[in-house]
Amino acid sequence: MTAPTWIEAVVREFGKAAGLSGLALNDRGAAAISFENGAALRLEYAFDSLVAALTLPARLDPATAARLLAYAHPEARYGFKLRAGYLSKGGRAVFAARLADREVTLPALNSVFSVLWRIGQEFGGAS
């Protein structure tokens, strides 16, 4: 799905601020960045929302599952709803946030990324 021009501009500005001048949504409304530590950030525009998802290498065991659930608990306060899960194919934890198109601003995207990255550090993958 093609994103509105102004959302594409926010993503480009986010990339420039992060030193990734080539970051832009493709014709499907998606962009991805892989980091040296194995973490990956994916941005995707669909259904009038921009989703930011950070994935990290992880093994699934009861302790990991409990930690994933704790991060996504309704009482956790991040300023947005956080979803957490596990991708068995590839063995990756995933943390995601959805911003409605009217909420997509450079400060909001920076805030979401900062929280996702901090959670990744706490979880043990992003550094």
Predicted stretch roles:
Residues M1-A40, R77-L87:
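Charge-rich, low-complexity N-terminal segments
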Residues P4-I7, D61-A65, L109:
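Generic alpha-helical secondary structure
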Residues I33-E36, L41-L54:
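Short, well-structured hydrophobic secondary-structure segments
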Residues V51-G90:
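Short, internal acidic amphipathic alpha-helical interface segments
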